[in-house]
Amino acid sequence: MLVLINTIQEQASEAIKQATDIVALEQIRVDFLGKKGKLTELLKGLANLSAEEKPKVGQLVNQAKQGISALIETKMIELKEKQLLAKLAAEQIDVTLPGRNHSTGSLHPVTQVKHRINDYFSRLGFDIVEGPEIETEFYNFEALNIPGHHPARAMHDTFYFGDGRLLRTHTSPVQIRTMEQRKPPFRLIAPGRVYRCDSDVTHTPMFHQVEGLLIDKQATLAGLKGLLQDFFSYFFGRELALRFRPSYFPFTEPSAEVDIECTQCNGKGCRSCKFTGWLEVLGCGMVHPNVLIAVNIDPNEYHGWAFGMGMDRLAMLYYGIDDLRMLFENDLTFLRQF
């Protein structure tokens, strides 16, 4: 019996050494240790042995099972390591291969213009403030001295909600809210989206505007003129002639519209400026006393000036774009130029 047990152990050991994969190794386990395996059959034959032989033979068979199990476990670890290494070798990535190209994005031309404007005015100590795009009639009209019969308050010019609120038509409400919260003197600009019922080559229902405001005891129209002259020279990178034309805005008095020398023809006259040599770029003026009174600022002590200009318009002039709608069509071929 001892010889038979040793023979089975040797057979199992040799078979385990020859196993080349996990499936073959599992079959060896079944052949020697399974329900019908060779060692299991020996245990079944213990019933035919004498009472003295049973314990000895049973102990030897169990030792053989433990030895074979240990060999199988060791071989299993070895085969799994080889299998993993083979898989890694098959899936190896060549890090020297060139990577896949990804197109890089860029800032939208209007965003670039906004950054240039913010950079200029922040250097002069202006705060950059923002406010809600859904406004009340008080902040959008009444506090700005725009009466109920003014055309700007008509349905065909302003987007109204059912509850009487509206999409702001300018960023002036931001200035009103700021004046309510702060004590003068202060200076600020308010860039943001605004909305009006208009759509053509030079107008869109949504556009970008930036407005500036300064409240101080020494604010003058001459100071505003000098600031705007310096700003446009900075923005376009060269000296430009400015022209102030008398105008009317409910929230400023006196009011003016500002033209700059045409950037396309240097004031000589072309299609862009309709052969006038001038391009209209903004409206401005001294803050109306009624606006100051609406926010509890004494107009006898403080004065202010304000201006407003379209950032989309400036982007068109700066980059030579002739159709405003191109800025909003999300054409990557067009936008990648900037």
Curated annotation (Swiss-Prot):
EC number: 6.1.1.20
InterPro entries (UniProt xref): aa-tRNA-synth_II, aa-tRNA-synth_II/BPL/LPL, Phe-tRNA-synth_IIc_asu, Phe-tRNA_ligase_II_N, Phe_tRNA_ligase_alpha1_bac, Phenylalanyl-tRNA_Synthase, tRNA-bd_arm
Catalysis performed (reactions): tRNA(Phe) + L-phenylalanine + ATP = L-phenylalanyl-tRNA(Phe) + AMP + diphosphate + H(+)
Details of cofactor binding: Binds 2 magnesium ions per tetramer.
Assembly behavior: Tetramer of two alpha and two beta subunits.
UniProt record similarity statement: Belongs to the class-II aminoacyl-tRNA synthetase family. Phe-tRNA synthetase alpha subunit type 1 subfamily.
HAMAP family: Phe_tRNA_synth_alpha1 (MF_00281)
Protein name: Phenylalanine--tRNA ligase alpha subunit
Native species: Legionella pneumophila (strain Lens)
